[in-house]
Amino acid sequence: MRRGVSPVIAGRNAKRLEQLKTEYPTIEARVTSTDDSRSLDDAFASIAVVINCAGPFLDTSAPLIEAALRNGVHYLDIAAEQAAVIAAFERFSEAAQRARIIVAPALGFYGGLTDLLVTAAMHDWTHIYECEIAVALDSWHPTRGTRLTGERNTGPRWFFAQGNLERRDPLPSRDWEFPQPFGRQEVASLALAEAILIPRHVQVADIRFYLNKLSIAELSNPNTPPPVPQDATGRSAQTFLVDVVVRKGQETRRAIARGRDIYAVTAPIVVEAATRILDGRCNVIGVQAAGELFDARDFLIALGSDQLTVQFGRPVS
């Protein structure tokens, strides 16, 4: 609504939708369910782009993409699960081309943001040897959706190494020297959507993604409470830093993003994407990664410093 569009909210919980309408009385609400294709078609009527923020995406992505295809509606989601992202590319690429729509999975903090940062760090490079992405969170209080996704996301983990997507064990934990205020942190290797998205449009041999173990410990603890809003926008007190290093030969380039609340920053990312699709700044169709769709640096800057602070430079040795 802040961007001047007229959103329609849709979901399976009629009571929750009514609560949202009480808070935002001008918004239209539509009850729908992923196991009812007719209700999905009704929900997508007269819609230009749908943003799926209802996980687990292993369950919701496919039926919503199918509905988007039937109704000629662009589809965006914020999945981090590799299997859901792989399925979007493998199952729906040709159909999305025929329907002349954009399907853009993983446009959230994990996946879309890091893909854009890698693309922006490369700048005018056409290929790189490797990229390393290290994320530091000062805490991780998971939402109920994150908990449900973790329970559902039990499939194989894929890593991108030596130019191939392959199933293997994670790399050993290591230390990463983050910029302040995080400093040196022990990080663990994880397999998320980055390994699927970045090779779609970047010629690269190796992709390594790390997350600081402090935040993993909180996520793994079933007693860690959900996030609590700390300001008028609903953001929690959580802070994050994403450190991206790309290498080509002996040269290195870097992009660093700082902000608050990994959940809250996802909203401006996916809404910026939807806005650019609606106003015609995307001239491609089909299933696409964020770095393919948008001018990465322009996109990141457009988010505004109140959401995300981004800088580019040389890595710290």
Question: Locations of the language-model features?
Answer:
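N-terminal Rossmann-fold cofactor-binding loop
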Residues: 10-14, 33-34
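Rossmann-fold NAD(P)-binding glycine/threonine-rich loop
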Residues: 61, 79-102
